[in-house]
Amino acid sequence: MIQRMNNFSKNDIISIRDLSKDDLEQIYSKTNEIMEMDADQRREIARGKTLGYLFFEPSTRTRLSFQSAMALLGGTSFGIADATSSSVQKGESLADTVRIMSGY
């Protein structure tokens, strides 16, 4: 079973700039560990986990990559692919939108 990265400095990542060099090294190391697993083992990594996403700009490739990765790891994903279809567009704060999404 894959071990959680205990020293990871962030819970929420908004930008690559949010990550330290140590964080990136942990991610690369964990990626290598996952790549050595067979498909059945990989599907257990995110079983029971859900990824929520909110894109403020259209980003088909990135969104599909996130969705595909979660599916391959056994998890699910949901989100808003374009902020113009969210309540942020109607004046709801980003914090409120994130709070609502985190409940799922």
Question: What does each model-identified segment do?
Answer:
Residues 1-64, 68:
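Positively charged, low-complexity intrinsically disordered leader regions
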Residues 50-104:
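Active-site cofactor/substrate anionic-group-binding motifs, chiefly glycine-
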